[in-house]
Regions:
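Active-site-adjacent structural elements that line small-molecule/cofactor binding pockets in enzymes
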Residues: 1-205
Length: 205
């Protein structure tokens, strides 16, 4: 399903649970429109939105279908985060970037959460970890062993320090996959087959 559409449906049938995307491929969308959609969603759910974003890239055909050069995806996500935050927080807002430019525009309604909803960065690559440290309010990990998890947190800390940011209030989350089978090996084979197909990677031992 399209994640933000699904979260809008959940907003109407829940009252307390936080609603988040894990993760939204921001490079495939126009960030000014995304700012409006997510601001509306945060209003509908009463300030419960967590906006999880990522680069993706496992399936280049997604980018081809959207007319987005695959090699630009990281740069588009980094800039898109700044675009979304600018429109969430400023009225009027102006932005001059590589992919997006506007002068004296605004969106309404603004998000309920102030100064803006949290943005969590998903990914395992060094580029994703650096982005989380520079721009994120949190990090979403997935399919990572404890040693690599600890190393990743240190990379995030160093990136934040280089950007002159503190990590007070920074949140770490983990995307967990659960597979049920008659025994461990059966469940594991099903998990590896499903995840390898979904992410176009080999998740085998």
């Amino acid at each position: 399903y399209e994640s933000l559409t699904l979260l809008a449906a959940y907003a109407g049938i829940t009252t307390r649970i936080r609603l988040g995307s894990g993760v939204y491929l921001l490079a495939l969308r126009q960030p000014t429109v995304v700012a409006k959609i997510t601001s509306t969603l945060d209003t509908l759910c009463g300030g419960r939105l967590i906006f999880g974003v990522g680069v993706g890239g496992e399936n280049p055909k997604e980018f081809e279908a959207c007319g987005v050069p695959h090699q630009e995806r990281g740069a588009r996500v980094s800039e898109g985060i700044d675009v979304v935050r600018t429109l969430w927080r400023e009225t009027p807002a102006s932005f001059q970037g590589r992919f997006t430019r506007f002068e004296n525009v605004s969106i309404d309604p603004k998000p309920v959460q102030k100064p803006s909803p949290p943005i969590w960065i998903g990914g395992r690559s060094d580029a994703a970890l650096a982005r989380a440290g520079r721009q994120g309010d949190g990090w979403i990990s997935y399919v990572v062993q404890p040693e690599r998890y600890a190393q990743s947190l240190e990379k995030i800390r160093r990136a934040a320090e280089a950007a002159g940011r503190g990590l007070d209030g920074f949140v770490t989350a983990h995307l967990t996959f659960v597979t049920v089978g008659r025994d461990y090996e059966t469940a594991k084979r099903s998990w590896v087959r499903t995840l390898s197909s979904r992410y176009a990677q080999d998740f085998g031992p």
